[in-house]
């Protein structure tokens, strides 16, 4: 049985990318090629490419599925009425005026109390707790106040404060549905020029929405990974995407998820027969080695943290040993890791 320690690996801290490259598609791409079955049925070849070379690994019959969520400025600093400092990180927008949020304070705020945020620009009312989160009531439409006064919530391993450059580069060029507190980072490598080349090559694309929560950075704390409680995220699958998947299957093409968030949404909505059901809902799907994939054939993804649920996910897709070999190579070849880092192309084992 695989344990948490099986998903650890040494990573020099200087390989954690602290800023995005100026040219989105200039990042590197590690292609994990699966060799034809022979004496070693799980043999792979690791190929170093530029991300813009990905077009050479795609066919006109293929379908790229992107997550069009948009990162909101979800972080606030403020004060309680007592003067004590408070930090708020919005996790999910529940309705026009209400959000779920993490609240950090020296003392737990009482239900009904006010939190004065953004240098007292406005105050939110503390509502009931939901697990580790608080419901907060905004005095005006929450998304408007978030956009006007909030700060971009960069991942915890990025050490600088967010600036105007991050506000552009920590969004995909196709982001349109606000609600995420972390970017679907595999999509950061795509730009308009690469989309034009994909269109010219006949490679089709479609979109879903999954609002990435801060739980994506939540560490696994149990050595027995089956005991880990996965965070929940909201997703939506359109009838147009379901039709595109059906057409792709008819044409003999592959469904390629752009990012682990797209993969999790697709697998959550997939039926046992491999068809995709339109609709929306919450998913806490936890994909680990041994999972039987219903829909996704390949994945474009960044490099993930040691001992993370996302490292377990890519190991389930490509194979534990293949991922270990790929990550060893990536460290030796000085690939850039995590959200602002380089990418991989993986096919299902």
Swiss-Prot record:
**Keywords recorded for this protein, A-Z:** Cytoplasm, Queuosine biosynthesis, S-adenosyl-L-methionine, Transferase
> Does the keyword Metal-binding feature in the UniProt annotation?
no
At the top level, the lineage of the source is Bacteria
This protein's pathway reads:
tRNA modification; tRNA-queuosine biosynthesis
**EC number in record:** 2.4.99.17
Q: Which GO terms describe its biological process?
A: queuosine biosynthetic process; tRNA wobble guanine modification
Q: What are the GO cellular component annotations?
A: cytoplasm
Q: What does this protein do?
A: Transfers and isomerizes the ribose moiety from AdoMet to the 7-aminomethyl group of 7-deazaguanine (preQ1-tRNA) to give epoxyqueuosine (oQ-tRNA).
Q: Which family does it belong to?
A: Belongs to the QueA family.
Q: What protein name is recorded for this chain?
A: S-adenosylmethionine:tRNA ribosyltransferase-isomerase
Instruction: Name the species this protein comes from.
Output: Cupriavidus pinatubonensis (strain JMP 134 / LMG 1197) (Cupriavidus necator (strain JMP 134))
**Gene name tied to this protein:** queA
